[in-house]
Structures are given as structure tokens and as C-alpha cells.
């Protein structure tokens, strides 16, 4: 099975459809943080769990596509352990629950949901990209699917109609940096995520 080549505008359309079905006001009302955790658990009926995924926080999230088991790090015992997991579980590293990492937490949740929406048929087993079975190299497949997941995550957390509405309301008298900070606070995303979103739409 090959990786689908999905145009950016097609991914934007997927994101709009998800938000429209959940709550149309997220696209047309007062700009606000998208309740991504609630969308994951109620609209998609997925299980959201928080654990220490690895000793070093290099992997912040994993999406489980089949019933099975995963290896997680136990900070108390200081060793890895195996736990049973069900298909439709999203695992998030609990160290992201620090209030200072709110933007990173929300983006990671959206990113993992994006894998479920876009890549469910591409995965087998309970791993992350390593479990992918395809006809391209693992490095190439990893890059493609991660970019696609990032794009959908951005679309979900920073809907384009709302981003444009905010941008044109706030831009007068503000530097790009000030604009990025204010808009990141409104949507509860990181400054980096907001900067990338605005640049990708040629707004800054």
C-alpha cells in the first residue's frame, strides 16, 4: 500500500469538515481555542490517555490502530513496562500537561488525531511510524505522513477563516511578533505553530 499524496487544500477541507460537523461556530463565531481533546473523545469516540511514553521525551504521542500492547516508561520504578492498549487509543506524554506546555500539548493531540483520520489504513500493529507497511523507505514515509499530520493539526487548531478574521482585526499597529503572540494566546497554540500557520497562508 502506498502513501496517499494529499494536497494541502484537500487536508484543509478535511479539517473544515470535522469542525463544521462538531460545531460550526468554530469556523464562524468568535475566534477561540478549538476543544481538541473533547473532539477526540466525543466526535471520534477515541480514548485519550496520558503516560510517560519514553524515558527521554522524544516521542510525545502515539496513535494505536490495533488492539495489542505498547512499552511505556515507569518513572517510579525507573524501568520500561508493557501495557495492553485498545485500537483507537491516543497516548500523550504526561509531561506535556505542564501549563507552560499547553500549546505543545494541544498540537500533539491534534497531530495524533490527524494520524487517525488520514493514515489509519496505512498502519498495522500498535507502534507509530515503525509499524507502517509500505513500498517506500521508512524515512521517506515518515516525512510524508508527519507533514500531512502537521497540516491537519494546524487546520484543526487554527481554522483558516478564524485565522484570517483575527489577523485582519489585529494587524494594524502591531509588529509581526506581537501579532503572533496575541493570536497564539487566542487559539492556545505555541508561537512557533502560529508563525508557521501565518507564513503558510502568506499572511506574514
Task: Pin down the residues of each PLM region.
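Active-site hotspot residues in diverse enzymes, especially metal/ion-binding acidic/histidine motifs
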Residues: 1-204
Amino acid at each position: 500500500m502506498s502513501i496517499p499524496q494529499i494536497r494541502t487544500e484537500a487536508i484543509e477541507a478535511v479539517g473544515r469538515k470535522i469542525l463544521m460537523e462538531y460545531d460550526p461556530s468554530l469556523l464562524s463565531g468568535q475566534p477561540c481555542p478549538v476543544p481538541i481533546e473533547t473532539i477526540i473523545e466525543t466526535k471520534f469516540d477515541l480514548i485519550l490517555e496520558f503516560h510517560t511514553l519514553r524515558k527521554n521525551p522524544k516521542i510525545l504521542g502515539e496513535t494505536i490502530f490495533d488492539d495489542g500492547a505498547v512499552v511505556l516508561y515507569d518513572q517510579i520504578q525507573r524501568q520500561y513496562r508493557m501495557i495492553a492498549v485498545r485500537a483507537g487509543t491516543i497516548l500523550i506524554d504526561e509531561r506535556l500537561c505542564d501549563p507552560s506546555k499547553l500549546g505543545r500539548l494541544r498540537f500533539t493531540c491534534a497531530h495524533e488525531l490527524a494520524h487517525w483520520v488520514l493514515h489509519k489504513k496505512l498502519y498495522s500493529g500498535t507502534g507509530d511510524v515503525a509499524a507502517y507497511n509500505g513500498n517506500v523507505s521508512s524515512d521517506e514515509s515518515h516525512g510524508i505522513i508527519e507533514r500531512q499530520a502537521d497540516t491537519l493539526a494546524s487546520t484543526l487548531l487554527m481554522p483558516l477563516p478564524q485565522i484570517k478574521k483575527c489577523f485582519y482585526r489585529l494587524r494594524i499597529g502591531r509588529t509581526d511578533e506581537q501579532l503572533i503572540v496575541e493570536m497564539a494566546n487566542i487559539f492556545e497554540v505555541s508561537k512557533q505553530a502560529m508563525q508557521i500557520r501565518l507564513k503558510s497562508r502568506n499572511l506574514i
